């Protein structure tokens, strides 16, 4: 484990390197069961971009930038990757946005990237409205604190991550066979399922369904880890036929 902020990370397991980028404000809370299963196959490097699990929760946090998270992830990989080897990468939610940007900026040593329900909703038809609805649905009248002794990772996410990250609109072309954009089976018909499908089509990736919903990593860690391992090590699953993204309202 290293406490060096802003590139804090934890390492467990053995095998090829797999970088995990958690969602929310990057705190890896709840990912233990998933990490434990993945560690049987990979050297799992869990990235903590703000150091929230490494003693910095409650300290002041600036407005976050996607590029800062992806560059931090790149530096972590440069530190932990053995010479000549490539890394597998998984990110969910805001972490999914960060790993897409990582692939756009530094594709050279990435074997395969899986981005799970990245909320790049501005790419959808009427994306500005959909983004505003998403923010309104998460941002209640009394959000949890982002600083001080009672600060929570959710408070940090709402105050400093949600708005800049949901404004991010990736526009690169992924190297063939090296990107999968995933959504939960329980998310069918919902905003982030549509977003994942559109991203896979636009970025030259494959689309895959994973167990559970947006929190499938927490809800079904065993099944999620098994499918993630298969997707990473065997390449992109069969891409579903492109479909028209719905707008509502």
Regions found by a protein language model. Give the residues of each.
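Conserved hydrolase catalytic core segment
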Residues: 85-124
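Active-site loop/oxyanion-hole signature of alpha/beta-hydrolase fold enzymes
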Residues: 49-87, 199
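Short beta-to-alpha linker loops that shape the active-site pocket of alpha/beta-hydrolase fold enzymes
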Residues: 48-52, 119, 211-213
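Charge-dense, helix-prone N-terminal extensions
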Residues: 2-4, 51, 83, 94, ...
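Catalytic active-site module of serine/aspartate enzymes centered on a nucleophile-bearing elbow/loop
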Residues: 203-249
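Conserved HGGG/HGGXW glycine-rich cap/lid loop of the alpha/beta-hydrolase fold
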Residues: 2-56
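Helix-rich cap/lid subdomain of alpha/beta-hydrolase
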Residues: 118-166
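Conserved serine/cysteine hydrolase catalytic core
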Residues: 147-218, 225
């Amino acid at each position: 484990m290293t406490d060096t902020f802003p590139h804090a990370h934890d390492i467990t397991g053995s095998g090829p390197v797999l970088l995990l980028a958690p969602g929310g404000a990057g705190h890896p809370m709840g990912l233990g069961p998933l990490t434990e299963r993945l560690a049987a196959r990979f050297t799992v490097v869990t990235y903590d971009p703000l150091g929230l699990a490494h003693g910095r929760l409650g300290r002041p946090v600036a407005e976050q930038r996607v590029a800062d998270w992806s560059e931090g992830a790149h530096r972590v990989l440069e530190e932990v990757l053995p010479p000549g080897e490539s890394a597998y990468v998984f990110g969910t939610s805001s972490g999914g946005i960060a790993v897409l940007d990582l692939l756009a900026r530094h594709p050279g040593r990435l074997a395969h990237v899986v981005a799970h329900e990245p909320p790049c909703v501005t790419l959808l038809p009427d994306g500005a409205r959909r983004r505003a609805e998403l923010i309104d649905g998460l941002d209640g009248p009394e959000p949890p604190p982002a600083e001080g002794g009672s600060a929570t990772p959710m408070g940090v996410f709402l105050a400093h991550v949600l708005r800049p990250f949901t404004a991010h609109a990736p526009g690169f072309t992924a190297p063939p066979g090296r990107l999968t954009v995933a959504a939960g089976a329980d998310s069918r018909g919902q905003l982030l399922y549509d977003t994942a499908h559109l991203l896979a089509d636009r970025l030259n990736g494959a689309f895959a369904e994973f167990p559970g919903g947006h929190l499938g990593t927490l809800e079904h860690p065993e099944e999620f880890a098994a499918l993630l391992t298969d997707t990473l090590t065997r390449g992109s699953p069969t891409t579903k036929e492109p479909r028209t993204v719905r707008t509502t309202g």
